[in-house]
Amino acid sequence: MQVQLTNRQQHILWATVRHYIATAEPVGSKALVEEYDLGVSSATIRNVMGVLEKSGLLYQPHTSAGRVPSDSGYRIYVDQLITPSLRDTTRAEVLAKEVESALQQHLQWEDWSLEILLQGAAQILASLSGCISLITMPQTNTASVRHLQLMQIETGRIMLILVTDSYETHSKLMDLPPARSETKPDPEVIDRELQIVSNFLNSHLRGRSLLEISTLDWSQLDREFQSYGEFLKNSVAELAHRSAAPAATQIMVRGLAEVLRQPEFSQLQQVKTIIQLLEEEQEQLWRLIFEEPELEDTHKSKVTVRIGAENPLEPIRTCSLISSTYRRGGVPLGSVGVLGPTRLDYESAIAVVAAAADYLSEAFS
């Protein structure tokens, strides 16, 4: 989500989110004047907060109350106000060292079973983040690619079909890439191009694990077909990972008691639906946290942040889910994540998840 804010609006949104995260109370201009050096009057802050409310970034839970961040407000906070600072400051490094130290101190890889080790890692992650922690068991035996085919269904629409070694079939409908659809090429030309790209996919991916698809080097595709490569890169990986969930998914879950102390979880029914998701619908949750983001360097962890209604699973649409994959040789093995209220310390949670994923990647290498 891209919203252009002035420097003043950015500072006031940042302060509002920080204050609400710390207090769980609606934020008024007086509190911001007292707690933050914003260099403007209370009246100016009120005016700016009004503008942010009209933009959908803040809202008032009650007419007489202060304002709280919306999901969109948190999204701007994460994408524009804190993510750059995480790259430029030492806070992420400090948290990463804390995670690594705790994992090294408490986990003995030579002596314990893998399940016990990951349970211990999940407990450490929950303690450091104050959230529900989620760690999936590594997927070492997954289906492999038998065949990939692109075909034109109708003008401007194509279908990607994936057949696994066990003859399971998965498909995805897509529009043609803009670079091709705008020129309105002859359908026979499109059919030939799709076959060439299909041949490329099969020559490079047949027999490989579904989890290895994200490592495909699309630059080897002929230059004249690069528009397909740029367009299909995420779609092929997404379809493969959607198809890769094993018959039995196992997720280590820790920290439920800690996060349920938060005021957002005071309603018994909401707590019950979250517990039901964690206990009875692990395959859906596995697919969600194991979804692969696009990576420039497949040996590094990239963190995915889903805020509130961005989560497709209904029980957690009032929560934030932060996740990343751990890898071996660039191939994803499993996932690490934390789940908490939308009012959570995103800086710490993002850094902790990234550090845990990097540590597990090194441990499995």
From Swiss-Prot:
Superkingdom of this protein's organism: Bacteria
A Pfam family assignment: HrcA
A Gene Ontology BP annotation from the UniProt entry: negative regulation of DNA-templated transcription
UniProt keyword annotation of ATP-binding present: no
Disulphide bonds in the chain: none
Gene Ontology molecular function: DNA binding
Swiss-Prot/TrEMBL keywords: Repressor, Stress response, Transcription, Transcription regulation
Keyword set includes Iron: no
Role, per record: Negative regulator of class I heat shock genes (grpE-dnaK-dnaJ and groELS operons). Prevents heat-shock induction of these operons.
Family to which the UniProt record says this protein belongs: Belongs to the HrcA family.
UniProt-recorded name of the protein: Heat-inducible transcription repressor HrcA
Encoding gene, per UniProt annotation: hrcA
